[in-house]
Amino acid sequence: MTTGQLVHINLGKVRPLRVGERKLMSAIGKTPVIGPVAVGLLGLAGDEQADLSVHGGLDKAVYAFPLAHLAFWQQQRVTRSVSLFEETDETLPPGFVGENLSLTGLTEDAVYIGDRLHFADCVLRVTQPREPCGKFNAVMGYAQAARDMVQSGCCGFYLAVERVGTLQSGETFELVPGARQMSIAQALAPKRHKHMR
């Protein structure tokens, strides 16, 4: 049995994001919240998405991300001199890459499409890896960030809500295996060619 912990729940509101000379609406930078958060079929109460053609919906209701990956992304920014912090040993804050759930105990190679995360009061089902867009480049501060996400596999994964309820930061969950035919890492691999350009 695989178990993990929900360390942070992160919510965001749609706001302007500068992408080059353009200003686009985005909710990518999310903030950790304290207290129970209601989980509905379309996601977490109080969380927003700007472009519903590519974000949100039943199969992308919640975005989960291994908390340890934030250190990798901070290092990418430091390497390119776009660090948020002067200290190179600090990691980016939870929610920075747009994740709703900051998790420990799972990585993309150990999570499969169809697996279920059983929390005390709700059940979430793994649906697909995150494939980043240009807004991710803007938030990270360098033009190859989306490519680096796909190449590194440090992408996180989307979840559908199978049983509505509530989530609480700090609670544990159990990973219940599905058919185990394709891991998140395997599902992301075919997208690497697209992001080589």
Sequence positions of predicted segments:
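Loop/turn positions that initiate beta-strands
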Residues: 114, 164, 168-171
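A generic structural motif
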Residues: 101, 157-160
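A structural signal for small-residue-enriched, beta-sheet-centric alpha/beta enzyme cores
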Residues: 154-155, 171-173
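Short, acidic/hydrophobic/Gly-rich beta-strand patch recurrent on exposed beta strands
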Residues: 137-139
